[in-house]
From Swiss-Prot:
The modification Phosphothreonine is found at residues 182, 295, 366. Residues 107-227, 247-275, 312-465 are annotated as: Disordered. GO terms for molecular function: DNA binding; protein kinase binding. Residues 337-363, 385-398, 404-428 have a biased composition (Basic and acidic residues). Cruciform DNA-binding protein which exerts an enhancing effect on the cleavage of cruciform DNA (X-DNA) by endonuclease VII from bacteriophage T4. This is Cruciform DNA-recognizing protein 1. Residues 127-151, 451-465 have a biased composition (Basic residues). Keywords: DNA-binding, Phosphoprotein. InterPro entries: AMPK1_CBM (IPR032640), CRP1_MDG1_kinase (IPR050827), Ig-like_fold (IPR013783), Ig_E-set (IPR014756). It comes from Saccharomyces cerevisiae (strain FostersB).
Length: 465
């Protein structure tokens, strides 16, 4: 082990110069440690001083504003002619040590690490007064909430405070702790104990501490005082689940009550109220009888409607009023039926005639070299009416068409000169005189003729009439 001694020492220089540097054997006289200027104006620095043994010395010197000089406040030593240094011995270093129990930090060059030096004098009274006030407030609160044991602990705390006031120390604990709230053990004679031995308090195992908390949900297990009296701890049963379920299900099966006689009694009780519903049944039968009486009248009208179907020529139309001289049965009803029937029949006849006309007007295309053909003039209303009146007219037209085909070559020059009719002329020719409204034989004479809306089918009927 090394026998080196290390001490912290503060080097100082009075105020006045600008810069002060400390140098010596610790840095081989290189002047590497400047002193720090304090608020007072002087220069100081604290550094560890190492000594190889008790007889060894620490030599140093100051460089003030670039001038090497020696301080009069330290011991001086002449090393050689004209050279003088300051030095420190072990006695000088020991006198200046502050705290003997302070630890040193080797990484910091042996600097002290411990409590700061305590200032001399009695302890401050202001802190003691504050602590006493806080302790009194705390005690007053604890007295209200504590039990008898807590009251004893408060009395012991008062005794401790009186002792603190005599010795000059104060209790730092302000808040209540478990030590103060727990009951204190009986005091023992301290004088009998040896100075080096520690006093161990006796353990008071009372019944309250040994027994666990009996409240369910509290800390620790619940220990029942009479476990032998509880059946759950002693009785053990072996139960088969299937047998138990079958036995319980058999017991639960209950015969359902018969609902037959109850329903019959309810029907018999409600039977006297049923005759009220027989009245509308009689009325419906009477209505059905009236409807059956009206059916022959409607059947008498149907053959008349069937007779009106064939309307190919105007001769048939003229013969209708002669054969339909029948007294109207409920005129308004029959007239509506006839009018509806006429509208459908006329459309069907017109569609047939249009198909026949389209077949007749089809041109016969051949392979002849004839190019120009005579244009077909639109048929007038008179020509169409004549074609409808008799089938002989249609035969004559076919003969004329054959003659025209033979004489087409002769009429080429004539047809080229002729002009085609304009669209206005065609429209004028197609315009027809309004048809006179004739009163239907089945409708009542008193009714005025109704104006019908001319639709697509109405226009077709006008073309074929």
């Amino acid at each position: 082990m090394s026998s080196e001694l290390m001490f912290n020492y503060t080097f100082s220089w009075p105020a006045g110069p600008k810069d002060v540097i400390l140098t010596g054997t610790f840095d081989d006289w290189r002047g590497t440690l400047p002193l720090v200027k304090t608020a007072k104006g002087n220069f100081e620095i604290t550094m560890p001083v190492k000594l190889x043994n008790k007889d060894d010395t620490f030599q140093f010197k100051f460089i003030v504003d670039g001038v090497w000089c020696v301080s009069d406040s330290y011991k001086k030593e002449h090393v050689s002619e004209g050279i003088e240094n300051n030095f420190l011995q072990i006695t000088d270093l020991v006198e200046t040590q502050e705290v003997x129990g302070a630890s040193r930090i080797p990484e910091a060059g042996g600097l002290l690490c411990g409590k700061p030096p305590r200032s001399a004098g009695p302890p401050s009274t202001s802190n003691r007064k504050k602590n006493k006030r806080n302790n009194k407030k705390r005690k007053s609160k604890l007295k209200k909430k504590s039990t008898k044991n807590n009251k004893k602990s408060n009395e012991s705390x008062d005794d401790n405070e009186e002792e603190d006031x005599v010795t000059g120390t104060t209790t730092e604990d302000v808040t209540g702790t478990s030590r103060e709230e727990t009951p204190l053990a009986e005091p023992t004679n301290v004088s009998k104990e040896a100075p080096g031995n520690f006093h161990i308090l006796p353990i008071d195992q009372s019944a309250d501490t040994t027994q666990s908390n009996g409240i369910i949900g509290g800390p620790g297990p619940v220990l029942v005082p009479n476990p032998g009296e509880i059946k759950e701890f002693t009785e053990i049963r072996d139960v088969d689940a299937r047998e138990l379920n079958e036995r319980l299900n058999k017991k639960e099966e209950v015969p359902e009550p018969v609902a037959g006689p109850i329903v019959e009694s309810s029907v018999t009780e409600k039977s006297p109220a049923l005759p009220q519903a027989d009245d509308p049944i009689v009325e419906t039968k009477e209505m059905a009888h009236n409807v059956q009486e009206l059916t022959p009248q409607v059947e008498a009208v149907t053959p008349l409607i069937n007779e009106l179907e064939p309307l190919p020529t105007p001769e048939a139309q003229i013969s209708i009023p002669e054969s339909s001289k029948v007294e109207p049965v409920e005129g308004s009803l029959q007239s509506k039926l006839v009018e509806k029937r006429e509208s459908t029949e006329g459309v069907s006849d017109g569609s047939k005639k249009v198909e026949n006309k389209a077949k007749k007007d089809e041109e016969v295309f051949t392979l002849d070299p004839i190019v120009n053909k005579a244009p077909k003039l639109p048929l007038t209303d008179e020509q169409t009416a004549e074609g409808r009146k008799s089938p002989a007219v249609s035969e004559e037209k076919e003969k004329k068409k054959k003659q025209e085909k033979g004489s087409k070559e002769v009429k080429r020059s004539e047809t080229s000169k002729e002009k085609k009719p304009s669209a206005k002329e065609v429209k004028k020719q197609t315009v027809k005189a309004p048809k006179k409204q004739t009163a239907s034989p089945l409708s009542s004479s008193t009714e005025e003729p109704k104006k019908k809306k001319t639709g697509f089918f109405g226009k077709l009927k006008k073309l074929f009439k």
